[in-house]
């Protein structure tokens, strides 16, 4: 029996929170104490999936997992119920938290209650309450659970309302521009990520050019996508060009286009990236690799808004916002005469620093959970868990390759764990990660790279998969994540490489 005083104390306690996150944690800790549960979670509903906002009694990596309704029938049942849902211990619907409770990783959840949370009859989230005893919540009535759900819905709705008001001035006019469940997203609750999100919100709805600075593998392309998604140009194209992968002979044509007969092989007119991005955004990745002659031509387009296709004297007007990214120190490149000072100042109107993973180690459990869930889906697994000791190993590692290195490490570990354990619910252990050697530096030749030793006890197919995965990862790292260059280095057709990477779980 839940007393009115207990509910009143929860309501008053929520007023003491200094931030949304603090209030959410107070809420679920109070719920766990009030209902004597083993675990509880507050989740937000968005884009066909539940996103954990706060957890108690669950492993930290749960905060990074995403529970798409189409992949999690129990979550779908909660979303569609419209009221309290009690799942019996013998429910045929798998519990998404099985194996994700500390000290209970070998046990299944036996008592589960789901409370869908609504605002004006619209689903905004859910509160899940779990226990290891099948009769743990039998003495609590549905009406009492509804009262708890009402408190949770009010707290979540207030947070969402304040979030909408705070973003109102910079929200894009175009509906449906948030990332869906299939799109990668920026994961993290650290102060560094909070600062990054704030900077994106500040600049997104302006027309300023943005220079994204950061090491390889930090997610500069995700930042560019977030800026574009929050802009008034969100409905127009976001066109991507990797300047580092451009041979000098075709770079000008890629940027500005050409007309038929302009040079040998120009058999038809071709629009360049600037034309394709007209009225939208052009993301120039690794801008520091452009040659000085091309920098001069790029500067002219930025200054006057017109360009000429190769072989054509007719100027074309374009309206393009530039987002550029680099892992180089462009200020030093200017001093050394490798980058034009006037172009640098044009591009760096609003610089954004993408934090390295070592600057936000507290986000590693969330990222690990996020990649585990994506890997689970790509490999067709029922569950994919990571041991606490393995998670601690990941948190201690320096990650010179940043988020990309972490993602590849988890995918490789998942392939090894699946082969080693022969299970649809494998657990990633410390020995599945080989982190001592670190990633290859960009200058290392993939053909000469030492391969990471494989664990014993693997069958031929599993060992072959693990070897192929490790070789692709190392070659990809050596070519700065460029798939076309990786395919050439491995002497593979690009399409075959992408299909192999998907089968191995390296790509979603």
From Swiss-Prot:
Domain of life assignment: Bacteria
Residues within the DNA-binding region(s): 483-502
Alphabetical keyword list: ATP-binding, DNA-binding, Nucleotide-binding, Phosphoprotein, Transcription, Transcription regulation
GO biological process: phosphorelay signal transduction system
A Pfam family per the record: GAF
Domain Sigma-54 factor interaction: residue ranges: 186-415
Known pathway: Nitrogen metabolism; nitric oxide reduction
Entries under InterPro entries matching the protein: AAA+_ATPase (IPR003593), GAF (IPR003018), GAF-like_dom_sf (IPR029016), Homeodomain-like_sf (IPR009057), NorR (IPR023944), P-loop_NTPase (IPR027417), Sigma_54_int (IPR002078), Sigma_54_int_dom_ATP-bd_1 (IPR025662)
PTM-bearing positions, type 4-aspartylphosphate: 56
Binding positions for ATP per the UniProt entry: 214-221, 277-286
Gene Ontology MF terms in the entry: ATP binding; ATP hydrolysis activity; DNA binding; DNA-binding transcription factor activity
SMART domains for the chain: AAA (SM00382), GAF (SM00065)
Function of the molecule: Required for the expression of anaerobic nitric oxide (NO) reductase, acts as a transcriptional activator for at least the norVW operon. Activation also requires sigma-54.
Matching NCBIfam families: PRK05022.1
Protein name in the entry: Anaerobic nitric oxide reductase transcription regulator NorR
Source organism of this protein record: Aeromonas hydrophila subsp. hydrophila (strain ATCC 7966 / DSM 30187 / BCRC 13018 / CCUG 14551 / JCM 1027 / KCTC 2358 / NCIMB 9240 / NCTC 8049)
Lineage: Bacteria, Pseudomonadati, Pseudomonadota, Gammaproteobacteria, Aeromonadales
């Amino acid at each position: 029996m839940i007393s009115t005083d207990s509910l009143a104390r929860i309501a008053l306690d929520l007023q003491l929170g200094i931030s949304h996150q603090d209030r959410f944690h107070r809420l679920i800790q109070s719920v766990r104490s009030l209902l004597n549960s083993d675990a509880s979670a507050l989740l937000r509903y968005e884009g066909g999936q539940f996103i954990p906002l706060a957890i108690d009694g669950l492993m930290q990596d749960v905060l990074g997992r995403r529970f798409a309704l189409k992949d999690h029938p129990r979550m779908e049942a909660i979303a569609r119920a419209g009221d309290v849902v009690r799942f019996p211990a013998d429910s045929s619907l798998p519990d998404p938290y099985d194996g994700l409770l500390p000290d209970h990783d070998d046990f299944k959840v036996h008592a589960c209650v789901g409370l869908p949370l609504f605002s004006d009859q619209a689903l905004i989230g859910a509160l899940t309450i779990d226990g290891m005893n099948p009769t743990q919540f039998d003495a609590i009535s549905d009406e009492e659970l509804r009262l708890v759900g009402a408190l949770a819905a009010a707290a979540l709705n207030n947070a969402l309302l304040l979030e909408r008001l705070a973003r109102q001035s910079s929200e894009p006019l175009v509906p449906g521009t948030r990332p869906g469940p299939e799109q990668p997203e920026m994961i993290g609750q650290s102060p560094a990520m909070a600062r990054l999100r704030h900077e994106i919100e500040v600049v997104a709805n302006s027309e300023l050019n943005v220079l994204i600075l950061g090491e390889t593998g930090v997610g500069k392309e995700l930042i560019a996508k977030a800026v574009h998604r929050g802009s008034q140009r969100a409905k127009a194209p976001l066109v991507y060009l990797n300047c580092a992968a451009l041979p000098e002979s075709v770079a000008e044509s890629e940027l500005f286009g050409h007309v038929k007969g302009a040079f040998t092989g120009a058999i038809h007119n071709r629009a360049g990236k600037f034309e394709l991005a007209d009225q939208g955004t052009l993301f120039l990745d690794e801008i520091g690799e452009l040659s000085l002659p091309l920098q001069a031509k790029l500067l002219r387009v930025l200054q006057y808004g017109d360009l000429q296709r190769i072989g054509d004297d007719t100027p074309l007007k374009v309206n393009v916002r530039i987002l550029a990214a680099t892992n180089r120190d462009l200020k030093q490149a200017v001093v050394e005469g490798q980058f034009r000072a006037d172009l640098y100042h044009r591009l760096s109107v609003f610089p954004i620093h993408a934090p390295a993973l070592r600057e936000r180690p507290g986000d590693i459990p969330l990222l690990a959970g996020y990649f585990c869930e994506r890997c689970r889906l790509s490999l067709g697994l029922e569950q994919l868990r990571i041991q606490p000791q393995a998670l601690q190993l990941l948190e201690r590692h320096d990650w010179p390759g940043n988020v990309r290195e972490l993602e590849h490490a988890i995918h490789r570990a998942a392939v090894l764990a699946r082969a080693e354990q022969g299970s649809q619910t494998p657990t990633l252990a410390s020995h599945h990660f080989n982190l001592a050697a670190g990633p290859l530096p960009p200058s290392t030749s993939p053909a000469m790279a030492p391969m990471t030793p494989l664990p014993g006890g693997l069958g031929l197919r599993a060992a072959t998969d693990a070897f192929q995965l490790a070789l692709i990862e190392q070659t990809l790292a050596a070519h700065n994540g460029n798939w076309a260059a990786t395919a050439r280095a491995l002497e593979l057709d690009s399409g075959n490489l992408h299909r192999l990477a998907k089968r191995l779980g390296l790509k979603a």
